[in-house]
Curated annotation (Swiss-Prot):
Annotated keywords: Cytoplasm, NADP, Oxidoreductase, Queuosine biosynthesis
Catalysis: reaction(s): 7-aminomethyl-7-carbaguanine + 2 NADP(+) = 7-cyano-7-deazaguanine + 2 NADPH + 3 H(+)
Species of the source: Pseudomonas fluorescens (strain Pf0-1)
Any one annotated GO CC term: cytoplasm
Lineage: Bacteria, Pseudomonadati, Pseudomonadota, Gammaproteobacteria, Pseudomonadales
Name of protein: NADPH-dependent 7-cyano-7-deazaguanine reductase
Gene: queF
Length: 276
């Protein structure tokens, strides 16, 4: 477990405060998890962002009438801190009985508070249910590898040694799997996700990639670090000209977390999958 997470509200009984309380936000430094992967803030081999979507966003108009909306937040992958998810939920709940003059005022407050917690500017969009409903759900790009026939017996830790490639062939492709699962390092609750790998480099053996993804099944780590580990393991193996790893996780507590790590600029839109 991350030492800072021990002091977070995650896994503990919490009072649900319904009036604006920005102090509820609990930042967790990324440095310890970066160090586990041999990284520092100065040596990150990727660009990226963590997309968060909130489906339980509500506040009051000056008249006292409630409003509901969907919040979209983008936290830079190189920000000093992640925001612990339960504290994020508690903070958003504290808006429920708080009046705001208009949506712009709410967005400005969210930008201020979330940027202070993350240690870097956070993008915020407050969207109407109608707008999000019109977008529907999308399918992941590329080839789904989930129907490949594999045998698996070890689920405790990620196993990069399973990954194989053909160095004699250079390909550019996009593949995805819906079989990503890991566990919360604090509560041990399951985190279910789908992951996309897009790259140009040595041809990756798809069955070995699926075996590797399944090896995360009992691994305990935060969403962000799972994606970073996948990115680094693939980068070491493939030595690619370009590489993107993007995961979309099933929501918990009204929030879903979708980390994106890439050698390229962030391009993928924040569109929901069928499990989101």
């Amino acid at each position: 477990m991350h030492p800072a997470a021990e002091h977070s509200p995650l896994g503990k009984s919490s009072e649900y405060i319904a009036t604006y309380t920005p102090s509820l936000l609990f930042p967790i430094p990324r440095t310890a998890k970066w160090a586990e992967l041999g990284l520092t803030a100065e040596t990150l081999p990727y660009k990226g962002v963590d997309f968060w979507n909130c489906f339980e966003l509500s506040w009051l108009l000056p008249s006292g009438k409630p409003v509901v909306a969907i919040g979209e937040f983008s936290i830079p992958a190189d920000s000093p801190n992640i925001i612990e998810s339960k504290s994020f939920k508690l903070y958003l709940n504290s808006l429920n009985q708080t009046p705001f003059a208009d949506t712009a005022s709410l967005e400005a407050t969210l930008v201020k508070d979330l940027s202070a917690a993350a240690g870097k500017p956070v993008g915020v969009r407050v969207r109407s249910l109608k707008d999000v409903e019109a977008e529907g759900v999308v399918a992941l790009p590329g080839v789904c590898i989930d129907d490949l026939d594999i045998s698996v017996s070890d689920y405790e830790h990620p196993r990069p040694e399973l990954l194989r490639c053909d160095d004699s062939r250079v390909v550019e492709e996009s593949v995805h799997s819906h079989l990503l699962k890991s566990n919360c390092p604090v509560t041990s609750q399951p985190d279910w996700g789908s992951v996309v790998v897009e790259y140009r480099g040595a041809a990756l053996d798809h069955a070995s990639l699926l075996e590797y993804i399944v090896s995360f099944r009992q691994h305990s780590d935060f969403h962000e670090q799972c994606v970073e580990r996948i990115f680094l393991d693939l980068q070491r193996l493939l030595k690619p000209e370009k590489l993107t790893v993007f995961a979309r996780y099933v929501r918990r507590g009204g929030l879903d977390i979708n980390p994106y790590r890439s050698t390229e600029s962030v391009q993928l839109p924040n569109h929901r999958l069928v499990r989101q």
